């Protein structure tokens, strides 16, 4: 096992133990080692791991930079699933920052890639992200529409647990929109 890979493994172990600052340092070292070796794909994975740790540390601006850097590297290597994952990650950071419009833009990009790849469950996950973000914006009818889209995709994908959660969210929102019986 080469040094960069060992450093990545060290980072994973540190994350598991809750040592986020130390994990961040390990992923930064791995990212630099992979960059020096010209291995853009593994560099992008280290960059993603770094950004995920930065989210845990609530350093959102740095996390966005990390996810965007990983996105660019994954785009260069045509790793479309990883590209979509980065868009989803970017969307979630924007959502956590209270930037719903930016979140929606990123989630929509992720959704488009997953749909193009025929990955229904992952597409449905993005629909639930869009629904939740629409709910945050008080766009309740749109949120309901997106929960229903997720429900359909989860059903097609055979993802029963996620389908049940989407159905529950859609039912609660639909009931709230109908208001109390007169």
Task: Please annotate each region the language model reported.
Residues 5-18, 25-28, 32, 41-56, ...:
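Conserved alpha-helical positions within TPR/SEL1-like repeat arrays
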Residues 154, 159-182:
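Terminal, low-structured helical/coil segments at or just beyond the last alpha-helical repeat
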Residues 1-2:
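Long, contiguous interaction/recruitment modules in multidomain scaffold/adaptor proteins
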């Amino acid at each position: 096992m080469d040094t960069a890979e060992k450093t990545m493994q060290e980072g994973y172990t540190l994350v598991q133990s809750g040592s986020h600052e130390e994990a961040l340092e390990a992923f930064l070292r791995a990212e630099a080692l992979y960059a020096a070796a010209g291995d853009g794909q593994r560099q992008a994975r280290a960059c993603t791991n770094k950004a995920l740790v930065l989210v845990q540390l609530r350093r959102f601006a740095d996390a966005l930079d990390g996810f965007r850097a990983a996105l660019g590297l994954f785009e260069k290597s045509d790793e479309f699933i990883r590209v979509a994952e980065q868009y989803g990650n970017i969307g979630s950071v924007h959502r956590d920052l209270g930037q719903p419009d930016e979140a929606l833009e990123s989630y929509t990009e992720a959704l488009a890639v997953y749909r193009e790849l025929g990955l229904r469950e992952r597409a449905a996950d993005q629909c639930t992200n869009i629904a939740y973000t629409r709910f945050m914006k008080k766009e309740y009818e749109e949120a309901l529409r997106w929960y229903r889209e997720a429900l359909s995709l989860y059903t097609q994908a055979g993802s029963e647990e996620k389908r049940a959660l989407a159905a529950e969210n859609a039912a609660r929102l639909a009931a709230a929109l109908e208001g109390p019986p007169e």
